Amino acid sequence: MKIKNSLKALRERHRNNRLVRRKGRVYILNKTNPRFRARQG
């Protein structure tokens, strides 16, 4: 999982990316292609 400051550009890299908020953190999750996972930090 990558740690990035801005997730907007990462979300547009793949059409199945989902923006999810969990426990005060923002994640990009992708079930079909997990290498696109990222966390804002």
From Swiss-Prot:
GO cellular component: ribonucleoprotein complex; ribosome
A Gene Ontology BP annotation from the UniProt entry: translation
GO terms assigned for molecular function: structural constituent of ribosome
Signal peptide: none
Classification via InterPro entries: Ribosomal_bL36, Ribosomal_bL36_sp, Ribosomal_L36_bact
Coiled coil: none
Alphabetized PROSITE patterns for the sequence: RIBOSOMAL_L36
Keywords annotated in UniProt: Ribonucleoprotein, Ribosomal protein
Annotated PANTHER family: 50S RIBOSOMAL PROTEIN L36 2, LARGE RIBOSOMAL SUBUNIT PROTEIN BL36B
Family per record: Belongs to the bacterial ribosomal protein bL36 family.
Protein name: Large ribosomal subunit protein bL36
Organism the protein comes from: Bartonella henselae (strain ATCC 49882 / DSM 28221 / CCUG 30454 / Houston 1) (Rochalimaea henselae)
